[in-house]
Amino acid sequence: MLTKMTAFLARAPALRGLSLTVGDVGPAPYTAGLWCRGITVLDRRENLLGRVTQRCRAEFTLRLCLPCTDADNAARLLDLQIWAAAESAAGRGPVLGNAGREVLRAEQGRMERADAGGTAVYTVRLQAEYTRVYTEETT
């Protein structure tokens, strides 16, 4: 799941020039780190034949370490959120489920902290809602 989300974000124009990895972001400017905050099952249904359908939400946090240029960084965060919404609407988001349409949201972009070394750390919250269908295997 992290691999798919990282590959998806690597296509984002707002993240060009950044080194994107799984895990926390280091102190070096132009780096980004992604990790999964967890998965929540929103709905679970089971039919008489044992087929289980789950609607899930995976939550991720993306941290970016950038030089302190407030206007440029604010625009970068907005551009990323707009791009993610457009990709999701067009059906070009990461495929996390195996049935139905998936919805991806990037939201709550904000500055987390500014460091004395002239860099700032920003966070963006990513949520992906998807459906997984499980069928009981018979022998």
Can you describe what each PLM-predicted range is?
Residues 30-39:
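A short, hydrophobic beta-strand-centered structural micro-motif
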Residues 1-25, 40-139:
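Charged, amphipathic alpha-helical segments and their flanking helix caps
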